[in-house]
Protein backbone atom coordinates (compact mmCIF):
# COMPACT_ATOMS: atom_id res chain seq x y z
CA UNK A 1 0.00 0.00 0.00
CA UNK A 2 2.86 2.31 0.91
CA UNK A 3 4.55 1.44 -2.43
CA UNK A 4 1.41 2.45 -4.34
CA UNK A 5 1.31 5.79 -2.56
CA UNK A 6 5.01 6.37 -3.34
CA UNK A 7 4.43 5.70 -7.05
CA UNK A 8 1.45 8.08 -7.24
CA UNK A 9 2.25 11.07 -9.45
CA UNK A 10 1.94 14.34 -7.51
CA UNK A 11 -0.82 16.62 -8.77
CA UNK A 12 0.12 19.88 -10.54
CA UNK A 13 -0.72 22.96 -8.49
CA UNK A 14 -3.75 24.84 -9.83
CA UNK A 15 -1.81 28.13 -10.00
CA UNK A 16 0.80 26.51 -12.28
CA UNK A 17 -1.92 25.09 -14.53
CA UNK A 18 -3.47 28.55 -14.86
CA UNK A 19 -0.09 30.07 -15.72
CA UNK A 20 0.47 27.44 -18.41
CA UNK A 21 -2.99 28.02 -19.88
CA UNK A 22 -2.47 31.80 -19.85
CA UNK A 23 0.92 31.38 -21.56
CA UNK A 24 -0.55 29.07 -24.22
CA UNK A 25 -3.43 31.51 -24.84
CA UNK A 26 -1.03 34.48 -25.09
CA UNK A 27 1.22 32.54 -27.49
CA UNK A 28 -1.75 31.62 -29.71
CA UNK A 29 -2.93 35.24 -29.65
CA UNK A 30 0.55 36.49 -30.56
CA UNK A 31 0.86 34.02 -33.45
CA UNK A 32 -2.58 35.03 -34.70
CA UNK A 33 -1.59 38.71 -34.58
CA UNK A 34 1.70 38.06 -36.40
CA UNK A 35 -0.15 36.10 -39.09
CA UNK A 36 -2.66 38.94 -39.51
CA UNK A 37 0.18 41.49 -39.75
CA UNK A 38 1.97 39.38 -42.36
CA UNK A 39 -1.24 39.09 -44.37
CA UNK A 40 -1.84 42.87 -44.06
CA UNK A 41 1.73 43.71 -45.21
CA UNK A 42 1.36 41.41 -48.21
CA UNK A 43 -1.93 43.11 -49.17
CA UNK A 44 -0.33 46.56 -48.70
CA UNK A 45 2.63 45.62 -50.93
CA UNK A 46 0.22 44.57 -53.66
CA UNK A 47 -1.75 47.84 -53.37
CA UNK A 48 1.48 49.91 -53.44
CA UNK A 49 2.72 48.02 -56.51
CA UNK A 50 -0.57 48.57 -58.35
CA UNK A 51 -0.58 52.27 -57.46
CA UNK A 52 3.02 52.74 -58.59
CA UNK A 53 2.14 51.08 -61.90
CA UNK A 54 -0.94 53.34 -62.33
CA UNK A 55 1.09 56.47 -61.51
CA UNK A 56 3.77 55.49 -64.02
CA UNK A 57 1.08 55.09 -66.67
CA UNK A 58 -0.42 58.49 -65.74
CA UNK A 59 2.97 60.27 -65.89
CA UNK A 60 3.74 58.68 -69.26
CA UNK A 61 0.34 59.80 -70.58
CA UNK A 62 0.96 63.38 -69.36
CA UNK A 63 4.36 63.45 -71.09
CA UNK A 64 3.01 62.03 -74.36
CA UNK A 65 0.11 64.49 -74.27
CA UNK A 66 2.56 67.42 -74.09
CA UNK A 67 4.57 66.01 -77.01
CA UNK A 68 1.40 65.46 -79.05
CA UNK A 69 0.08 68.99 -78.41
CA UNK A 70 3.43 70.55 -79.36
CA UNK A 71 3.57 68.46 -82.55
CA UNK A 72 0.02 69.45 -83.53
CA UNK A 73 0.80 73.14 -82.95
CA UNK A 74 3.94 72.93 -85.13
CA UNK A 75 1.99 71.16 -87.84
CA UNK A 76 -0.58 73.97 -87.83
CA UNK A 77 2.19 76.59 -87.97
CA UNK A 78 1.54 77.77 -84.40
CA UNK A 79 3.52 77.88 -81.18
CA UNK A 80 2.51 75.53 -78.40
CA UNK A 81 2.17 77.30 -75.06
CA UNK A 82 2.23 74.81 -72.15
CA UNK A 83 -0.17 75.22 -69.24
CA UNK A 84 0.93 77.50 -66.41
CA UNK A 85 3.08 75.56 -63.90
CA UNK A 86 1.30 74.66 -60.67
CA UNK A 87 4.33 73.60 -58.64
CA UNK A 88 7.55 75.36 -57.64
CA UNK A 89 10.58 74.28 -55.67
CA UNK A 90 12.15 77.10 -53.68
CA UNK A 91 15.68 77.12 -52.22
CA UNK A 92 16.97 79.76 -49.83
CA UNK A 93 20.47 80.83 -50.96
CA UNK A 94 21.31 83.81 -48.69
CA UNK A 95 21.31 84.90 -45.07
CA UNK A 96 18.88 87.54 -43.82
CA UNK A 97 20.98 89.76 -41.56
CA UNK A 98 19.66 93.31 -41.73
CA UNK A 99 16.66 92.52 -43.96
CA UNK A 100 13.19 93.95 -43.47
CA UNK A 101 10.74 92.18 -41.13
CA UNK A 102 8.48 91.56 -44.16
CA UNK A 103 11.14 89.53 -45.96
CA UNK A 104 11.94 87.64 -42.77
CA UNK A 105 8.24 86.85 -42.24
CA UNK A 106 7.74 85.58 -45.80
CA UNK A 107 10.77 83.29 -45.52
CA UNK A 108 9.29 81.89 -42.30
CA UNK A 109 5.93 81.33 -44.02
CA UNK A 110 7.78 79.46 -46.78
CA UNK A 111 9.53 77.44 -44.02
CA UNK A 112 12.95 78.52 -45.30
CA UNK A 113 14.62 79.16 -41.95
CA UNK A 114 18.15 78.15 -42.98
CA UNK A 115 20.41 78.62 -46.00
CA UNK A 116 20.00 75.77 -48.53
CA UNK A 117 16.63 74.75 -47.12
CA UNK A 118 14.15 73.89 -49.88
CA UNK A 119 10.37 73.52 -49.99
CA UNK A 120 7.63 72.81 -52.52
CA UNK A 121 5.16 75.65 -53.12
CA UNK A 122 1.78 75.54 -54.84
CA UNK A 123 1.75 78.38 -57.36
CA UNK A 124 -1.12 80.85 -57.27
CA UNK A 125 -1.41 84.64 -57.21
CA UNK A 126 -0.70 84.89 -53.47
CA UNK A 127 2.31 82.54 -53.45
CA UNK A 128 3.85 84.18 -56.54
CA UNK A 129 3.61 87.57 -54.81
CA UNK A 130 5.37 86.08 -51.77
CA UNK A 131 8.15 84.70 -53.97
CA UNK A 132 8.64 88.12 -55.56
CA UNK A 133 9.08 89.72 -52.12
CA UNK A 134 11.93 87.36 -51.20
CA UNK A 135 13.32 86.80 -54.71
CA UNK A 136 16.81 88.24 -53.92
CA UNK A 137 17.21 85.56 -51.23
CA UNK A 138 15.93 82.49 -53.07
CA UNK A 139 16.39 80.42 -56.21
CA UNK A 140 13.22 78.82 -57.51
CA UNK A 141 11.66 77.19 -60.53
CA UNK A 142 9.50 74.36 -61.81
CA UNK A 143 10.67 70.88 -60.76
CA UNK A 144 10.18 67.91 -63.06
CA UNK A 145 9.07 64.45 -61.94
CA UNK A 146 12.64 63.17 -61.54
CA UNK A 147 13.52 66.07 -59.22
CA UNK A 148 10.42 65.54 -57.06
CA UNK A 149 11.08 61.79 -56.91
CA UNK A 150 14.78 62.12 -56.07
CA UNK A 151 14.26 64.83 -53.44
CA UNK A 152 11.61 62.86 -51.56
CA UNK A 153 13.41 59.52 -51.75
CA UNK A 154 16.88 60.86 -50.92
CA UNK A 155 16.14 63.73 -48.52
CA UNK A 156 12.55 63.12 -47.46
CA UNK A 157 11.84 63.54 -43.76
CA UNK A 158 8.42 63.68 -42.13
CA UNK A 159 7.16 65.83 -39.29
CA UNK A 160 6.01 63.26 -36.73
CA UNK A 161 5.16 64.49 -33.22
CA UNK A 162 7.09 67.69 -34.02
CA UNK A 163 10.22 65.63 -34.73
CA UNK A 164 12.19 65.22 -37.97
CA UNK A 165 11.89 61.53 -38.84
CA UNK A 166 13.47 59.87 -41.91
CA UNK A 167 10.85 58.30 -44.19
CA UNK A 168 12.46 54.87 -44.27
CA UNK A 169 9.22 52.91 -43.92
CA UNK A 170 5.84 53.30 -45.62
CA UNK A 171 4.15 52.56 -42.29
CA UNK A 172 5.23 56.03 -41.07
CA UNK A 173 3.36 57.60 -43.98
CA UNK A 174 0.34 55.34 -43.55
CA UNK A 175 -0.01 56.25 -39.86
CA UNK A 176 0.07 60.01 -40.52
CA UNK A 177 -1.66 60.28 -43.91
CA UNK A 178 -3.57 56.99 -44.26
CA UNK A 179 -6.91 58.68 -43.55
CA UNK A 180 -6.36 60.65 -46.79
CA UNK A 181 -5.65 57.46 -48.76
CA UNK A 182 -1.90 58.23 -48.84
CA UNK A 183 -0.01 55.15 -47.66
CA UNK A 184 3.40 55.12 -49.38
CA UNK A 185 6.22 57.22 -50.88
CA UNK A 186 4.75 56.96 -54.38
CA UNK A 187 1.48 58.46 -53.08
CA UNK A 188 3.42 61.37 -51.55
CA UNK A 189 5.33 61.97 -54.81
CA UNK A 190 2.11 61.85 -56.84
CA UNK A 191 0.30 64.28 -54.52
CA UNK A 192 3.18 66.78 -54.66
CA UNK A 193 3.95 66.51 -58.38
CA UNK A 194 0.31 66.77 -59.51
CA UNK A 195 -0.54 69.35 -56.78
CA UNK A 196 -3.47 67.19 -55.67
CA UNK A 197 -6.34 68.09 -53.35
CA UNK A 198 -4.30 67.06 -50.29
CA UNK A 199 -1.16 68.93 -51.38
CA UNK A 200 -1.14 71.30 -48.40
CA UNK A 201 -1.41 68.51 -45.80
CA UNK A 202 1.24 66.35 -47.51
CA UNK A 203 3.60 69.29 -48.05
CA UNK A 204 3.30 70.33 -44.40
CA UNK A 205 3.99 66.72 -43.39
CA UNK A 206 7.30 66.89 -45.29
CA UNK A 207 10.06 68.57 -43.31
CA UNK A 208 11.87 71.33 -45.30
CA UNK A 209 14.59 69.69 -47.39
CA UNK A 210 18.14 70.22 -46.12
CA UNK A 211 20.22 70.41 -49.28
CA UNK A 212 23.99 70.35 -49.69
CA UNK A 213 26.03 73.31 -50.87
CA UNK A 214 25.89 73.11 -54.71
CA UNK A 215 28.78 71.36 -56.42
CA UNK A 216 30.88 74.04 -58.07
CA UNK A 217 29.51 76.69 -55.71
CA UNK A 218 27.27 79.68 -56.41
CA UNK A 219 28.23 82.37 -58.95
CA UNK A 220 26.61 85.57 -57.76
CA UNK A 221 23.93 85.21 -55.09
CA UNK A 222 22.94 88.89 -55.20
CA UNK A 223 22.31 88.98 -58.97
CA UNK A 224 19.21 87.64 -60.73
CA UNK A 225 19.50 84.44 -62.75
CA UNK A 226 18.59 86.18 -66.03
CA UNK A 227 21.56 88.52 -65.48
CA UNK A 228 23.99 85.67 -64.90
CA UNK A 229 23.48 85.30 -61.14
CA UNK A 230 21.78 82.75 -58.92
CA UNK A 231 18.72 84.47 -57.41
CA UNK A 232 15.14 84.43 -58.66
CA UNK A 233 13.10 82.30 -61.02
CA UNK A 234 15.10 79.97 -63.24
CA UNK A 235 12.04 78.06 -64.53
CA UNK A 236 12.97 74.49 -65.55
CA UNK A 237 16.68 75.18 -64.94
CA UNK A 238 15.93 74.64 -61.24
CA UNK A 239 16.27 70.92 -62.00
CA UNK A 240 19.98 71.33 -62.76
CA UNK A 241 20.49 73.17 -59.46
CA UNK A 242 18.58 70.46 -57.57
CA UNK A 243 20.87 67.80 -59.07
CA UNK A 244 23.92 69.77 -57.90
CA UNK A 245 22.55 70.08 -54.36
CA UNK A 246 20.79 66.73 -53.82
Swiss-Prot record:
One Pfam match: Ribosomal_L30
InterPro entries: Ribo_uL30_ferredoxin-like_sf, Ribosomal_uL30, Ribosomal_uL30_CS, Ribosomal_uL30_euk, Ribosomal_uL30_euk_arc, Ribosomal_uL30_ferredoxin-like, Ribosomal_uL30_N_euk
Location in or out of the cell: Cytoplasm
Keywords: Acetylation, Cytoplasm, Repeat, Ribonucleoprotein, Ribosomal protein, RNA-binding
Residues recorded with modification N-acetylmethionine: 1
GO cellular component: cytosolic large ribosomal subunit
PROSITE patterns to which the protein is assigned, alphabetical: RIBOSOMAL_L30
Ranges where the record places region 4 X 12 AA tandem repeats: 7-52
Gene Ontology BP, a term: maturation of LSU-rRNA from tricistronic rRNA transcript (SSU-rRNA, 5.8S rRNA, LSU-rRNA)
A single GO molecular function term of this UniProt record: structural constituent of ribosome
Sequence repeats: from-to residues: 7-17, 18-28, 29-40, 41-52
Entry annotated with the keyword Ribonucleoprotein: yes
Membrane-traversing stretches: none
Lineage: superkingdom: Eukaryota
Statement: the UniProt record of this protein carries the keyword RNA-binding: yes
UniProt family annotation: Belongs to the universal ribosomal protein uL30 family.
Known role: Component of the large ribosomal subunit. The ribosome is a large ribonucleoprotein complex responsible for the synthesis of proteins in the cell. Binds to G-rich structures in 28S rRNA and in mRNAs. Plays a regulatory role in the translation apparatus; inhibits cell-free translation of mRNAs.
PANTHER family to which the protein is assigned, alphabetical: 60S RIBOSOMAL PROTEIN L7, LARGE RIBOSOMAL SUBUNIT PROTEIN UL30
Subunit structure as annotated in this protein's UniProt entry: Component of the large ribosomal subunit.
Protein name, as recorded: Large ribosomal subunit protein uL30
Gene name of the encoded protein: RPL7
